[in-house]
């Protein structure tokens, strides 16, 4: 919930079969090449099963890529153009190719309190009631007021 995903970001971007004699898609999109051939259903099932996980309140920048089977923690930021090949811890900012941690978005104690609060599970009315606090309070003051 509340994930911010910029234009041209790719999440769970597909890979090619590195363990086969050819990388080309004629071997798994075979029906596009021959009338008597079928697509490789097992290959597509394997690709669908390799999903990326995106946490709550994340920001994935323009043209970033999040590879399959990678987890982006709650509150994390993926910089524009980054290629994420490993899990990103909650409230961590990553950048580069391959993506590497740049710094924590928030001090660990505040991040832990936000994780415990889980405001992203609040209903619409509670979010609206806290809107001014989201806009004006520091993270620490917000947590003090809202029980995190």
Residue ranges of each PLM-predicted region?
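Flexible, glycine/small-residue-enriched loop-and-beta-strand segment within the central core
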Residues: 1-70
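A generic "structured core" feature
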Residues: 73, 77-79, 83
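Conserved catalytic segment of ABC-fold P-loop ATPases
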Residues: 73-74, 89-91
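A short acidic/histidine/glycine-rich donor-binding loop in glycosyltransferase catalytic cores
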Residues: 99-100
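C-terminal boundary and immediately downstream tail of ABC-type ATPase nucleotide-binding domains
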Residues: 117-123
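C-terminal amphipathic helix plus adjacent low-complexity
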Residues: 134-148
